[in-house]
Regions:
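Short beta-strand/turn micro-motifs composed of small residues
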Residues: 112
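Inter-Walker segment of RecA-like/P-loop motor cores
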Residues: 127-172
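ATP-dependent helicase/translocase motor core
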Residues: 1-107, 116, 120-131, 156-160, ...
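Short beta-alpha connecting loops at secondary-structure transitions
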Residues: 106-109, 172
Length: 172
């Protein structure tokens, strides 16, 4: 079972505190519209409070980095630390999905350090939403995706791309 917590992952045991937090109009609307996934297996997943907090902080950091033009600077980066089995893939999926909807974001690259993670991440993303992201089998496919070209040279808008650090390094 899962308990509601605050943004510091402190359990909210008091029912009145919970209702003030969860049933606040903006919280409830955000949970329903941003932080739920109806999977390809027709199962509803609701993000845990710490996943929501992580996603909101990443999106907040992206917004600050854009507003203050901190591209490529340490101040513009960050990381989220989750333990094994804590839902990192769901957190990254929703973060990538929400970031890809920002007006000033052309693409979201989700970079993994191993080929098996590339496959595993794509499989999970497809479970969350079929076709929400694209993966690649080579550097040339990655280049095509970055240029918004399909395999026949026509236009295709690749918004979320999953790739390996090795393919990205070769491309750059």
């Amino acid at each position: 079972s899962s308990f509601w917590t605050d943004s510091n992952n402190k359990t909210i045991n008091d029912l009145i505190d919970f209702t003030h937090t969860f049933f606040a109009k903006h919280t409830l609307i955000n949970v329903l519209t941003k932080y739920c996934v109806f999977t390809s297996e027709r199962m509803l997943l609701v993000m845990r409070p710490y996943q929501i907090a992580a996603t909101e902080r990443i999106i907040g950091r992206i917004n600050v980095s854009n507003n203050y033009k901190q591209y490529g600077k340490t101040e513009g980066g960050g990381y989220i630390w989750h333990t094994t089995g804590s839902g990192k893939t769901l957190t990254s999926f929703k973060t990538a999905q929400l970031a890809s909807r920002l007006d000033y974001i052309d693409k979201v690259l989700f970079v993994v350090d191993r080929k098996d993670l590339d496959y595993q991440t794509m499989k999970e993303y497809n479970r969350f939403e079929e076709g929400a992201a694209d993966s690649n089998t080579s550097t040339s496919v990655l280049q095509r995706q970055l240029e918004n070209k399909d395999k026949n040279g026509g236009y295709h808008d690749y918004r979320i791309i999953i790739t390996t650090i090795q393919k990205l390094s070769i491309f750059i």
